[in-house]
A protein has these predicted regions:
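Active-site anion-handling motifs in enzyme catalytic cores
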Residues: 1-246
Length: 246
């Protein structure tokens, strides 16, 4: 993906970053690191913005699925306005995306962050250029933290949870973040612990990069397992736990 993006070195692009939590902030910080390295400048846009540049870059994540509508609504309203559209690594699935994908043209390049999304997009975005690449969270570079003590249970309680019940000791540390929030508090919390149990993908990615022992559990669709298989399985300090625990 970096080789592809080098084509835009020295240029300014319109940049759409949807809202979110600390997981989205990890992605955004990684994206900013990458674009700064490549000397690509951005003009932030939203649903109410005028087009500033001919190229649109949509930040990566898991928003282009049926649970959420930010990316879908933005694309429906804006896809015909741009000379070129680039999706940074995304998870994409669901019936609501099919019609949108089918309308995108050959000026659209979509990076999927795991194979399941790649198959889905290949099936319905027939005119687009589709590639696999890793989540932009991996463009963050964190110093390994000290070992820490104890276990952090950091499970979600929203529509992507499949837990039977939330453990009493749970701290959903991702929930109170937002897409561009500084990472200090998030990193400091994870650093305090030796082991992290979570179904939050970017809690897991962050903890892995910090050198923690990590158990990643499924969410309500294929995202966690698919990203684990494509990107995280190579790390020795993480396991995927495909079973009920609570």
């Amino acid at each position: 993906m970096k080789i592809f993006l080098k084509n835009y070195t020295g240029q300014c692009v319109d940049f759409f970053r949807f809202g979110g939590n600390y997981g989205d902030s990890i992605i955004w910080h990684g994206t900013m690191n990458l674009l700064a390295e490549l000397n690509i400048r951005i003009a932030n846009v939203d649903l109410l913005s005028e087009k500033t540049n001919e190229i649109l870059v949509i930040d990566g994540g898991g928003n282009f699925v049926d649970y959420y509508d930010d990316v879908r609504n933005f694309i429906i309203q804006n896809h015909e306005r741009y000379k070129e559209i680039i999706f940074l690594p995304h998870t994409i699935f669901g019936n609501k995306q099919i019609e949108v994908l089918s309308k995108l043209r050959s000026n659209t390049t979509i990076f999927c962050r795991e194979k399941e999304s790649g198959k889905f997009v290949d099936s319905f975005a027939k005119s687009c250029n589709v590639f696999l690449w890793h989540d932009c969270a991996f463009y963050n570079s964190f110093e390994k933290s000290e070992m820490g003590k104890g276990i952090l249970n950091a499970f979600r309680s929203d529509c992507e949870s499949i837990l039977k019940f939330i453990p009493e000791s749970n701290i959903d540390i991702s929930y109170n973040g937002f897409a561009t929030k500084p990472l200090n508090e998030f990193l400091d919390t994870i650093s305090q612990f030796e082991q992290i149990n979570t179904d939050r993908l970017h809690v897991a990615i962050t903890a892995v990069l910090l050198g923690k022992k990590v158990n990643l559990y499924p969410n309500s669709y294929f995202k966690n397992k698919a990203v684990f298989d494509y990107s995280l399985s190579k790390f020795p300090n993480i396991n995927f736990i495909n079973q009920d625990i609570f």
